[in-house]
Amino acid sequence: MISSKASDYQQRIGYVFTDPSLLLQALRHCSAGTPHNERLEFLGDSVVNLLIAEALFQRWPRADEGALTRARSELVRETSLASIARTMQLGEQLILGPGELKSGGHRRDSILADAVEAVIAAIYLDADLATCRTVVLPWFETALTALPVGKPEKDPKTRLQEWLQARQWSLPVYELIFESGDPHTKHFRVSCTLGELKLRTEGEGSSRRLAEQDAASHAINQLDSNK
């Protein structure tokens, strides 16, 4: 039986479920027992990538593969999905275990992003791809419109790599300094070393990839400040 709170939330996301149990599963973090949302998250990751790729393909008829790929990565990255979750007040609806609830899991980017993917999968399973497209794409409209057409900004690692390659210098070396937290609340610290420049920066994030991007961003900032 779906709660009145969850029932009201369906109006906020713009879709009323035929099978409300799918929404409840999408909102249940693994710390709260089963059935939780990890399988839905897996499916939702593929669905949202398809929807965004399709939207970009149609909107940017002259963009090359690289530009389309970078734009999609920008739109479906963890921080972007977490921003959508906050706009929809998704964190308030999450079903968390006592530990996650106490540690503020409903505010954590990784948990929010995973929940968005799970909700997308739930809509897809409850209806079909066409309905999912109609419901979900408006969530991304502001971010889609804000992207510079055909030329989305490259991520920090790509920008740093291209800057070094243009000068025929060695590529940066990323090393894990430490990781902490349980499997669902990981925190990573990574270093980025530029040999020829004797420059070393550090970055943090909820995944190693995000920590590397953060470290690369700090390196770019230092290079810019030394110009």
Swiss-Prot record:
Digests double-stranded RNA. Involved in the processing of primary rRNA transcript to yield the immediate precursors to the large and small rRNAs (23S and 16S). Processes some mRNAs, and tRNAs when they are encoded in the rRNA operon. Processes pre-crRNA and tracrRNA of type II CRISPR loci if present in the organism. Mg(2+) binds at E41, D114, E117. It is an enzyme of class 3 (hydrolase). It comes from Xylella fastidiosa (strain M12). CDD domains: DSRM_RNAse_III_family (cd10845), RIBOc (cd00593). The keyword Metal-binding applies. Homodimer. The active site is at D45, E117. GO terms for cellular component: cytoplasm. This is Ribonuclease 3. It is found in: Cytoplasm. It comes from the Bacteria. GO terms for biological process: mRNA processing; regulation of gene expression; rRNA processing; tRNA processing. Residues 203-212 have a biased composition (Basic and acidic residues). One of its GO terms (molecular function) is rRNA binding. Residues 203-227 are annotated as: Disordered. It holds the Pfam family Ribonucleas_3_3. Gene3D superfamilies: 3.30.160.20, Ribonuclease III domain. Keywords: Cytoplasm, Endonuclease, Hydrolase, Magnesium, Metal-binding, mRNA processing, Nuclease, RNA-binding, rRNA processing, rRNA-binding, tRNA processing. Residues 6-128 form the RNase III domain. Its EC number is 3.1.26.3. Residues 155-225 form the DRBM domain. Belongs to the ribonuclease III family. Its cofactor is Mg(2+).
